[in-house]
Design a protein with these regions (language model features):
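Structural and coupling elements of P-loop NTPases
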Residues: 1-679
Length: 679
């Protein structure tokens, strides 16, 4: 592949709801420039962009693909992103390095949930809209246009109008050139004609809106327009380009990607009018070729055979192969042996890279997603990429006990690849907990363990890390006495147990007259700490207890540290049983962000989960509900929230404190724990 200067590079991210045809649009673009000899189809499993088995089997995109498209002496770096919410982190990474988002809509569905979410999360990014699937039943371009205008405050302006609809859709009227473009299915061959007579009224209306949008992007043009002067074609094009790059208008296109109808006009507009790398807000106004080198990794691919691939955008400076760069996040040098241009899974090397381009590098030692690669002499640190926080947890374990080390290695590799996976070993339940973005995400992770790393993994219900404590103060005796020839065992203690909220455990001694020699105090404390690992109600760890050793007795020959440890354990058991033991559960601070229309349903659902709503505050068009909810009730909240809000809500939660479990709930937990023990 050629090396392209910055001015000839366009970085676009295809985004939108799942199933709108982003991958089909990518395939049509690369087919039109001759990268492929046949038009790849998602249903046939032969696309360049979707190449993982998990994608081919499900017919969905789960991982962003970089597919460069060489067109009219330019390189369009197309980032084909997933549309399903479980893989939103891929969208976040891609929109960090793209200069323009192309929002893809289905003409028969209009604005869908992920469209709303992405638009809401990236309000300042230059946008275009491609209304796809114009050939489908119930396709309606004008309804989609109204949907966009009703949902978003931006100036939504069509650049094209469709010729025909559903099965009769065959092309578009271009409001810039004022010509009709009729396309041959699949080949994309175009015939240019005059505008159909029956479209003249619509064309006139929308052409005027286009001219107005062009004028509003430039003060001189606006003055001329408001004074009633006619703008020239050159001035209109200049204004459209300004509006497209600074985001004052969102231009709308239409077509059928799967049939390759009206794809090249979008490509022409991207080349002619989309923001160039120099116009990226991060570097606008800088001499980017001569600035200190700065690149950011936005995606990592962990492959068991070729190792790790880091995909990055070069923001400033010029990069050559066989260069040593400096990872400013990790403060380590990294050798860039080769600069790799990815086309789906295919790789090609280039000798150098100009600022603004997107590429990959293999076999870096410490670099991960979000890191900045720069020079040691002039280090730069770019802002971290904001990835969504995973919220759905499950316990995992290898199907074969002998694969535990293998699973551990596989987890480390997948953590490199996916910033929205968390894996932790729960100290209380002894389970390995995988937290991800949703149930589909978890399924994909399990499949990757098997396919990439050869380890079969099963999921289990996540156990809640309950604790036990006491509510009363008691004084109890613990005596360990054993005689079996020779030295016996003798330890005898009196211990006072009382509730203590300041910390998990406090041990004090208040022994007078040497009834228990000082040398055995540590053994008593150790015995109590060991005993606290398992409470008397359901076998959960014990917390928030103060223990005071105040009396006892010893034997000059038979007493030992072990004997006093055993005496302490006996005292603890007796004390727990008589000091009104209770079960404690983890309570989480929860923040739920939803459109206002769902407020009542969300509050009702949180109340049904034994939650306490603490307050609400606005966040733009959304409301944030703050609550405290038991962890036991939040296990499937990711799925519940998606169901209640049709995917429009999101939430975060973090540990707040432990609180007593209500009696009716505690009885069920204790009974379940007993059954599990018997099994």
């Amino acid at each position: 592949m050629k090396v392209y200067p910055t001015s000839k590079i366009r970085n676009i991210a295809l985004v939108g709801h799942g199933g709108t045809g982003k991958t089909s649009l990518t395939e049509a673009m690369i087919y039109n420039v001759g990268t492929t000899k046949r038009l790849g189809k998602v249903d046939d499993g032969n696309t360049v962009a979707d190449f993982y088995p998990e994608e081919i089997n499900r017919k969905i995109t789960i991982s962003t693909s970089l597919v460069p498209c060489e067109y009219k002496e330019h390189k369009i770096n197309v980032l084909d992103t997933p549309g399903y919410s479980d893989f939103y982190f891929e969208v976040a990474g891609s929109l960090t390095v793209a200069d323009t988002m192309v929002m893809v809509l289905s003409a028969n569905a209009g604005v869908e949930v992920q469209t709303e979410i992405i638009w809401h999360d990236y309000p300042d990014m230059p946008k275009m809209v491609y209304v796809n699937k114009m050939d489908r039943e119930n396709a309606d371009f004008y309804k989609s246009l109204d949907d966009l205008k009703n949902n978003f405050s931006e100036n939504i302006v069509p650049v094209q109008l469709p010729i025909g609809v559903e099965e009769s859709f065959k092309g578009v009227v271009d409001l810039i050139t004022m010509k009709a473009y009729i396309f041959e299915k699949e080949t994309g061959k175009v015939t240019i004609e005059d505008i159909p007579q029956d479209m003249s009224d619509d064309v006139e209306t929308y052409k005027e809106a286009l001219i107005e949008a062009a004028a509003e992007a430039d003060d001189d043009l606006l003055t001329k327009y408001l004074e009633g002067e006619e703008l020239t074609d050159g001035e209109i094009k200049k204004g459209i380009k300004e509006a497209a790059t600074n985001g004052t208008a969102v231009f709308v296109f239409c077509g059928s990607a799967i049939n390759n109808i009206a794809v090249t006009p979008l490509m022409d507009f991207i080349v002619d009018c989309a923001a160039t790398p120099e116009q990226n807000q991060l570097i606008k106004g800088k001499d980017i070729e001569n600035e200190p080198l700065a690149a950011q990794v936005f995606k990592t691919i962990a492959d068991p055979y070729i190792g790790r691939l880091n995909m990055f955008r070069l923001y400033t400076g010029k990069l050559k192969a066989e260069t040593t760069l400096y990872n400013s996040a990790k403060e380590k040098d990294e050798k860039i042996a080769q600069i790799i241009i990815m086309t789906g899974k295919e790789q090609a090397n280039v000798a150098e890279l100009y600022p603004g381009d997107i590429a990959a590098v293999a076999k870096l030692n410490v670099t991960s997603t979000g890191d900045t690669l720069t020079t040691k002499a002039n280090p730069v640190v770019l802002e971290d990429i904001k990835f969504p926080i995973p919220t759905l947890s499950t316990a995992i374990e290898p199907k074969s006990k002998g694969d535990e080390d293998k699973l551990s290695g596989a987890i480390q590799r997948l953590l490199e690849e996916d910033p929205t996976i968390r894996v932790e070993k729960d100290a209380v339940t002894k389970q390995t907990i995988l937290t991800a973005m949703g149930d589909t995400h978890i399924d994909i992770v399990i499949e990757k363990f098997a396919r990439k790393f050869g380890v079969d993994v099963i999921t289990k219900e996540m156990r809640i890390p309950y604790r036990e404590t006491i509510r009363a103060t008691v004084e109890v005796e613990g005596k360990h006495k054993k005689q079996s020839g020779g030295h016996g065992q003798y330890g005898h203690v009196w211990v006072k147990f009382e509730p203590f909220t300041e910390e998990n455990f406090l041990f004090e001694e208040n022994v007078f007259g040497g009834s228990v020699p000082r040398q055995y105090f540590p053994a008593v404390e150790k015995g109590l700490i060991e005993a606290m690992e398992e409470g008397v109600l359901a076998g959960y760890p014990v917390a928030n207890i103060k223990a005071t050793l105040y009396d006892g007795s010893y034997h000059s020959v038979d007493s030992s540290e072990m004997a006093f440890k055993m005496a302490a354990r006996l005292a603890f058991r007796k004390g727990m049983e008589t000091a009104k033991p209770v079960l404690l559960e983890p309570i989480m601070n929860v923040e739920v962000e939803v459109p206002e229309t769902y407020m009542g349903d969300i509050i009702g659902d949180l109340n049904s989960k034994r939650g306490r709503v603490l307050g609400m505050e606005p966040a733009g068009k959304y409301q944030v509900i703050k609550a405290q909810v038991p962890l036991a009730e939040m296990a499937k909240y990711t799925i519940d929230l998606k169901s209640i809000t049709q995917g429009r809500g999101k939430f975060t939660m973090e540990f707040a404190q432990y609180e007593e479990v209500p009696a009716q709930n505690a009885d069920k937990i204790i009974e379940k724990a007993k059954q599990e023990k018997e099994e």
